[in-house]
Regions:
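Short regulatory "switch" loops immediately downstream of catalytic or recognition motifs
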Residues: 1, 90-93, 237-242
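Bacterial N-terminal signal peptides that target proteins for export
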Residues: 1-12
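Bacterial Sec-dependent signal peptides at the C-terminal "C-region" and cleavage site
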Residues: 16-31
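Active-site mouth of glycoside hydrolases
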Residues: 34-216, 225-229
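Extracellular glycoside hydrolase catalytic/binding regions
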Residues: 153-154, 159, 166-318, 322
């Protein structure tokens, strides 16, 4: 995306390249929804908000998948969903290659992402923009040469892309579950700094198990909570169920098992965790094989059914957040 006119930007002794010009982008509008943080509070257009979301990590896999998500946003919104998460790279089995080897955004995938963000903004919804996915996925097979500097460039390019399009209803996860940090020892603090160097107002999350850096704006998923800052569970699954383990994966099978299928106990635990994080923290984003499975089993960008084998899906959870008391 940013390959023609570049200028250097230095921070912390590093140098990254940012665009002087790019393809035509939407005109900045005063009526854009804007996400901010005030202390431990998340705010949308200045009003406190609790995150209630669905993890659509494979939404960029095809034009049809992107279109299906957009077509169902109103339905998700009707249940109280106000947030979706979309990943530029990954996720497991989906293998979206949203970053090119030079750390720029692939224009095919970024165009899909922009459509989703615009559609979400029109519905007063928030988008978690996920960047690096360094786990079990073919998404990184062309990036073996990357270094810390390349990772920083990727995050900086992502934030620049968001800024140029005036996408303000977003926050950014630089490194999903600290996977790149664990595999390559790349420092997430530097990635966050790279993003903030481009746009200090961009909300940068921390998503790893080690001590969060001071420059993280909020903690999500794997991160320990940060005193005085928000925390969101951004990949919520049924606790104590080995959901991402043998329940949904099998050696030698390059797709998920039990797609969109839940036991009664799983549902009960998922609902309890949802309430715990909405009432006791800043929100909850559900993750499901129903939403993430690649073809031919998914991705399913719709609610589906009651989570039984005959009627798989996450409608049961959506009905829970719609009907539960409280924020």
């Amino acid at each position: 995306m940013f390959k023609d006119f570049l200028r250097p930007l230095c921070y912390a002794g590093l140098s990254i390249a940012l665009p002087l010009s790019a393809a035509p982008t939407p005109t900045a509008s005063a009526d854009r929804n804007t996400l901010t943080i005030a202390g431990a509070e998340i705010r949308l257009n200045g009003e406190p908000v609790k995150i209630k979301g669905v993890r659509m990590s494979a939404a960029l896999i095809s034009d049809d998948t992107t279109r299906e998500l957009i077509d169902h946003l109103d339905q998700f919104r009707s249940y109280g969903v106000n947030t979706i998460s979309v990943y530029i790279m990954g996720s497991r089995f989906a293998d979206v290659k949203g970053y090119r080897p030079d750390a720029t955004l692939d224009p095919v995938y970024s165009a899909r992402l922009s459509r989703i963000i615009e559609a979400a903004d029109a519905r007063k919804m928030i988008v978690l923009v996920g960047c690096l996915y360094w786990g079990t996925s073919r998404a990184r097979e062309d990036l073996a040469h990357w270094t810390q500097a390349d990772a920083n460039h990727a995050i900086a390019n992502t934030v620049a892309w968001l800024k140029e399009r005036n996408h303000r209803n977003v926050f950014v996860d630089p490194d999903n579950e600290g996977m790149a940090n664990g595999a390559k020892q790349w420092r997430i603090a530097e990635m966050i700094e790279a993003g903030h160097a481009v746009d200090p107002t961009c909300i940068m999350a921390y998503n790893a198990k080690s001590t969060p850096p001071a420059n993280a704006d909020l903690a999500i998923h794997f991160s320990p909570r940060i005193p005085g800052k928000p925390y969101i569970e951004t990949e919520g699954t049924p606790p104590d169920s080995n959901y991402w383990g043998e329940y949904s994966k099998k050696q030698g099978v390059y797709n998920y098992l039990n797609v969109g299928v839940y036991t009664a106990e799983m549902k009960e635990r998922q609902n309890a965790a949802t309430t715990q994080h909405i009432d006791g923290a800043n929100g909850y984003i559900l993750a499901s094989t129903w939403l993430q499975a690649p073809p031919p089993l998914g991705p399913n960008m719709n609610p589906g059914g009651d989570g039984t084998r005959d009627n798989p899906g996450i409608k049961w959870w959506l009905e829970y957040i719609r009907d539960r008391p409280g924020p």
